[in-house]
């Protein structure tokens, strides 16, 4: 009974308290606040739905625009395909007609015995044919006047021999070989020296003599003036070296007997204005071997950093793969450093030789790129090499250089100190310092010699004992640091540069030095760098000199790749197919003779001009990118 009363009393008290709360009116305020919160959430949800609808409309418009662009791209690809096929059919038909005209000329003009008597009508018809040939050749010259150096703009922009240009069936163009491209380029240069004069025709009436390295060919040239003047005939016998199918490698035509010659005209010497290009004043550095290319996938110009748009003409180096605008050609960084054949060891843990190619000068591409960019933008920057750049950016750039095949554009890096730190980091993290463990003691001892002449001689001896990669890289770096020290804006004299690069490029005398030895070596390292920077510039420049003639011969020989020997045939072989038309024509032989005479003159800086050499190196093309 008592328990029941207690429970009832407790329940009664709870009811009383709740009644008091209701009477006070607090519950209504809380309910109103909840309703307001729900209203705020409802408004936010409404705004979110409106924004969602807006973005859905924008997405729909973007999808529509993308679909329209896809259709345009598809039509453009189809149109390119159609135009390529149409041009190839026209070229095949043109080649067939040229072959027929060639045979007619051979019959009418190669008769030296005079058995064929030409009437006035026949002379008029023959002069008409000659005018047609001259006009067509001149038109071709105008068409290719801007690409005489490489002759690649009229090559198939969608296809090449690598079958990697576009994503359609490459079997459509496999029947049109590279020889036709070479023929078109050869024809485009027939009148490069000026307007055509009286047309001459040369035909072979002799046979090839099977000897060791040459063949003897007899030829007759008949000149028929278009104004009905007297007909001139010239007969010559020439000895020709076996043709290597490379106009850049074919030797000059040497006449061995000209007793039957009725008339002869010496070749006019070419003036400086006839040069196809002017080489840079490089002091013997390795030059770039440029070829022209029509851009399909947009690329960036290395000298100026701007994008090269679709369909524009660009230049690409065969060796280092550098890309530039034609007008930026003279601003490309030198020397030309070919890319590595394989992938080096872990980043920053390799020897210097792991990061260089086998071509001289043996300098890592990262060093060349950094130095060229620093000299372009950093010679007016105070504290160059003393101020550190962002470590994260330096690490990212280093990975791009050593992992990616293409060289990143350092012109897009705003902070020049990042590039300086990149160069120092690369040299610092090599397995073996630039001056090597083996020779570090010799360099230190040479720097401590009090007599300047003896110290310089000992330094020369130590430099000569370095591996070629270390020696070339050291020379390139010293040339650069001397330029930095000569710039007053950088405020980095030889002493300051020695403080930066002493511990970087000079090794310690022992593998694991203690603190005392490290402190002693630092002073000696500074003396070594100061002594190296005091050596004359001419001494370092000699390591940058390369024999451009040997480089060109290596390029032409495909880096000494073994191949099947060429068959000894006459350059004026039988006229049977359009491909053999490019073997020997009167105008092409005249041009090759003139190019040979031009190359025999004394070149600038002791090396042959690359502009004349490049004309004979058009049989190979680099892989074009995919068009997706």
From Swiss-Prot:
Phosphoserine: residues carrying this PTM: 150, 155, 158, 165, 171, 204, 207, 215, 258, 388, 411
Q: Give UniProt keywords alphabetically.
A: Acetylation, Cell cycle, Cell division, Cell membrane, Coiled coil, Cytoplasm, Cytoplasmic vesicle, Cytoskeleton, Developmental protein, Differentiation, GTPase activation, Ion transport, Isopeptide bond, Lipid-binding, Membrane, Metal-binding, Nucleus, Phosphoprotein, Spermatogenesis, Transport, Ubl conjugation, Zinc, Zinc-finger
**What GO terms are given for molecular function?**
alpha-tubulin binding; beta-tubulin binding; gamma-tubulin binding; GTPase activator activity; microtubule binding; phosphatidylinositol-3,4,5-trisphosphate binding; protein kinase binding; protein-macromolecule adaptor activity
Tissue distribution of the protein: Highly expressed in testis, thymus and spleen and weakly expressed in brain, heart, skeletal muscle and kidney. In testis, expression is restricted to germ cells with the highest levels of expression found in spermatocytes. Not detected in adult liver. Also expressed in fetal liver and in several hematopoietic cell lines.
Q: Which residues carry this modification: Phosphothreonine?
A: 162, 343, 564, 577, 585, 602
Modified positions (N-acetylmethionine) in chain numbering: 1
**Residue ranges that the Swiss-Prot or TrEMBL entry lists as coiled coil:** 33-110
Q: Where in the cell is it found?
A: Nucleus; Cytoplasm; Cytoplasm, Cytoskeleton, Spindle; Cytoplasmic vesicle, Secretory vesicle, Acrosome
Q: Which GO terms describe its biological process?
A: actomyosin contractile ring assembly; erythrocyte differentiation; mitotic cytokinesis; mitotic spindle midzone assembly; monoatomic ion transport; neuroblast proliferation; positive regulation of cytokinesis; regulation of attachment of spindle microtubules to kinetochore
Q: Which GO terms describe its cellular component?
A: acrosomal vesicle; centralspindlin complex; cleavage furrow; cytoplasmic side of plasma membrane; Flemming body; midbody; mitotic spindle; nucleoplasm
Question: Where is the region Disordered?
Answer: 179-201, 242-284
In residue numbers, where are the Phorbol-ester/DAG-type zinc fingers? 287-336
PROSITE patterns named in the record: RHOGAP, ZF_DAG_PE_1, ZF_DAG_PE_2
| Gene3D superfamilies, sorted | 3.30.60.20, Rho GTPase activation protein (1.10.555.10)
Keyword Nucleus in record:
yes
Biased composition regions of type Polar residues, renumbered to the chain: 274-283
Membrane-protein topology = Peripheral membrane protein
Induction data: Expression is down-regulated during macrophage differentiation of M1 cells.
Record's comment on post-translational modification: Phosphorylated at multiple sites in the midbody during cytokinesis. Phosphorylation by AURKB on Ser-388 at the midbody is, at least in part, responsible for exerting its latent GAP activity towards RhoA. Phosphorylation on multiple serine residues by PLK1 enhances its association with ECT2 and is critical for cleavage furrow formation. Phosphorylation on Ser-165 plays a major role in mediating interaction with ECT2. Phosphorylation on Ser-158 does not appear to contribute to binding to ECT2.
Region annotation Interaction with SLC26A8: residue ranges?
107-286
Q: Which one Pfam family would you cite for this protein? A: RhoGAP
Q: Where is this site: Arginine finger?
A: 386
Known function: Component of the centralspindlin complex that serves as a microtubule-dependent and Rho-mediated signaling required for the myosin contractile ring formation during the cell cycle cytokinesis. Required for proper attachment of the midbody to the cell membrane during cytokinesis. Sequentially binds to ECT2 and RAB11FIP3 which regulates cleavage furrow ingression and abscission during cytokinesis. Plays key roles in controlling cell growth and differentiation of hematopoietic cells through mechanisms other than regulating Rac GTPase activity. Has a critical role in erythropoiesis.
About its domains, the entry says:
The coiled coil region is indispensible for localization to the midbody during cytokinesis.
Q: What is this protein called?
A: Rac GTPase-activating protein 1
The organism named in the record is Mus musculus
Encoding gene (name): Racgap1
């Amino acid at each position: 009974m008592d328990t029941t009363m207690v429970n009832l009393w407790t329940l009664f008290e709870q009811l009383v308290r709740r009644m008091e709360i209701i009477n006070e009116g607090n519950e209504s305020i809380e309910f109103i606040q909840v309703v307001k919160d729900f209203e705020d959430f409802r408004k936010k949800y409404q705004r979110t739905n409106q924004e969602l609808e807006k973005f859905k409309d924008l997405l729909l418009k973007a999808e529509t625009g993308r679909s329209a662009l896809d259709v345009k791209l598809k039509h453009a690809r189809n149109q390119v395909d159609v135009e390529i096929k149409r041009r190839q059919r026209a070229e095949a038909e043109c080649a067939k007609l040229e072959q027929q005209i060639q045979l007619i000329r051979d019959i009418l003009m190669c008769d030296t015995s005079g058995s064929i008597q030409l009437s006035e009508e026949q002379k008029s018809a023959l002069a008409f044919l000659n005018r047609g040939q001259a006009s067509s050749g001149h038109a071709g010259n105008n068409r290719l006047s801007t690409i005489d150096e490489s002759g690649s703009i009229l090559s198939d922009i969608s296809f090449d021999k690598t079958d990697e240009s576009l994503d359609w069936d490459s079997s459509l163009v496999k029947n049109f070989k590279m020889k036709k491209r070479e023929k078109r380029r050869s024809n485009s240069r027939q009148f490069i020296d000026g307007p055509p004069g009286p047309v001459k025709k040369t035909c072979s009436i002799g046979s090839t003599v099977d000897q060791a390295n040459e063949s003897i060919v007899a030829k007759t040239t008949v000149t028929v003036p278009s104004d009905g003047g007297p007909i001139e005939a010239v007969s010559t016998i020439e000895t020709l070296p076996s043709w290597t199918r490379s106009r850049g490698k074919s030797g000059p035509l040497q006449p061995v007997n000209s007793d039957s010659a009725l008339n002869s005209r010496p070749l006019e010497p070419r003036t400086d204005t006839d040069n196809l290009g002017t080489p840079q004043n490089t002091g013997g550095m390795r030059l770039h071997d440029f070829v022209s290319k029509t851009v399909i996938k947009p690329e960036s110009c290395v000298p100026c950093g701007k994008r090269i748009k679709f369909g524009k003409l660009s230049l690409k180096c065969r060796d280092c793969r550098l890309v530039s605008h034609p007008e930026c050609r003279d601003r490309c960084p030198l020397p030309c450093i070919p890319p590595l054949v394989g992938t080096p060891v872990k980043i920053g843990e390799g020897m210097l030789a792991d990061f260089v190619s086998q071509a001289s000068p043996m300098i890592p591409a990262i060093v060349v790129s950094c130095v060229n960019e620093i000299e372009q933008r950093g010679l007016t920057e105070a504290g160059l090499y003393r101020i550190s750049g962002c470590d994260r950016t330096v690490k990212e750039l280093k990975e791009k250089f050593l992992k990616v095949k293409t060289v990143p554009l350092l012109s897009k890096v705003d902070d020049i100190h990042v590039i300086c730190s990149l160069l120092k980091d690369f040299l610092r993290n090599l397995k073996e310092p630039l001056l090597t463990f083996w020779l570090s003691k010799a360099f230190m001892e040479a720097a401590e010699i009090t007599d300047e002449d003896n110290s310089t001689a000992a330094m020369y001896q130590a430099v000569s004992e370095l591996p070629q990669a270390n020696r070339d890289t050291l020379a390139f770096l010293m040339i650069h640091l001397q330029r930095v020290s000569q710039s007053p804006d950088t405020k980095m004299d030889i002493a300051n540069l020695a403080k930066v690069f002493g511990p970087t490029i000079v090794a310690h005398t022992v593998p694991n030095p203690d603190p005392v030895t490290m402190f002693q070596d630092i002073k000696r390292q500074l003396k070594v760098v100061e002594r190296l920077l005091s050596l004359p510039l001419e001494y370092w420049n000699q390591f940058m000199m390369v024999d451009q003639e040997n480089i060109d011969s290596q390029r032409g020989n495909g880096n000494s790749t073994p191949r099947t020997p060429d068959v000894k045939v006459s350059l004026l072989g039988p006229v049977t197919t359009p491909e053999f038309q490019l073997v020997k024509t009167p105008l092409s032989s005249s041009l090759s003779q003139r190019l040979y005479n031009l190359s025999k003159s004394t070149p600038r800086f002791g090396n042959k001009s690359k502009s004349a050499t490049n004309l004979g190196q058009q049989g190979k093309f680099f892989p074009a990118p995919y068009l997706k």
